[in-house]
Amino acid sequence: MISQGWWYLARASGIVAWLVLTASILWGIVLSTKAFPRRRRPAWLLDLHRWLGGLTIGLVALHVVAILADSYTPIGLVDVAVPFVSPWRPVAVGLGVVAMWALLTVQVTSLAMRRLPRRIWHGVHLVSYGTFALGTLHAVLAGTDRGAMLFQVTGVIAVLVTAWAVVYRLAHRTPVRRAVPRTVTRPPAEIGTSDPAL
């Protein structure tokens, strides 16, 4: 009975983690558009994005703990840390492991955002899109709820909305402005004076 409880917890935490990750990515895309200008944007909007990311990490951790505690699948500690070595559905589990490490990398660099060059932070942050794709594949290939109608409908809606948001963001992104060197103009020399540089 206890083992069955762990299995239900593993399934529920995995699905909710994926949904919260979806919400975090969508909210991040909204913040990067002109809907909320940075100068007028309340601090809680960015805090909500960070909170969703942290909540996703917590739910993934709960998902992993429940998987390890459950006896339904022969998955051990190494299997949830090293990709594609699990004896049970190695590809599906491996995709989830890669998504987990990618998610942790994004979260750690976000916490250290002020200490990193913006270009590096932004490049790592783009991994979030790949994390969503890997998490989706993991849920479809490894999830035992993939046959449920509610799961299928929710999954299709989440994927379509996220895909549309990503395409919209890429199509309306603001080009990076490059600094243009200023041309220094020297005042003309007065009549009767000599310029040593000439």
Identify the residue ranges that each predicted region occupies:
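Membrane-embedded alpha-helical bundles that constitute the cytochrome b-like, heme-associated redox core
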Residues: M1-L198
